[in-house]
Amino acid sequence: MTQVRGAARRTELFDALVDLLLAEGFAQLTLDDLAARLHCSKRTLYGLAGSREQLVRAVVVHFFRGATERVEAAVRAVDGPAAQVAAYLHAVARELAPASTAFFDDVAGFPPAAEVYERNTRAAARRVQQLVDAGVAAGAFRAVHAAFVGDVVSTVMVRIQQRGVAEATGLPDARAYEALSDLLLHGLRA
């Protein structure tokens, strides 16, 4: 029972850290700040990770793991290739919507967190390519070079992740994913 309670407390702390870091970023927050805000000890935080840097990376991993589960659930909830591509990209946008500019700027400026975001961006681009491949095979999308579409989507996703789209257009990441979804779906339909 203690292990279950410990795992639940660990998840609760990671969820609270995700909420805090998404809202405020993390560059300015010390372990003392985090412990005070979460009403726990620094020792408790060190139980989650060995250093502040490792904790930030672990929180970013936790965020993307949960986001991936919810995004895939959104895809499973709909039928048809166009609906699945739309569900995927709209769910990504929903997951990123709570994240502040400070969070994205801090992730971009902290290599361990940037690597996690980049890895998840690559996985998302591969997933979109799989959905497009399935749509072309089913005749729901016109015959396009799915690898090219995947590469274009990947390039845009990387630019979103690296803050290039926000700098060039002023669009927050979540809105940029919405715009990518609209562009992609209107370009693919037969």
Each PLM stretch: what is its role?
Residues 21, 30-31, 42, 52, ...:
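Amphipathic alpha-helical segments enriched in hydrophobic/aromatic and basic residues
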Residues 7, 11, 15, 19, ...:
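Generic detection of well-ordered alpha-helical segments
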Residues 1-24, 28-37, 53-57:
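Basic, helix-initiating cap at the start of DNA-binding domains
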Residues 90-130, 137, 166:
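Short secondary-structure transition hinges
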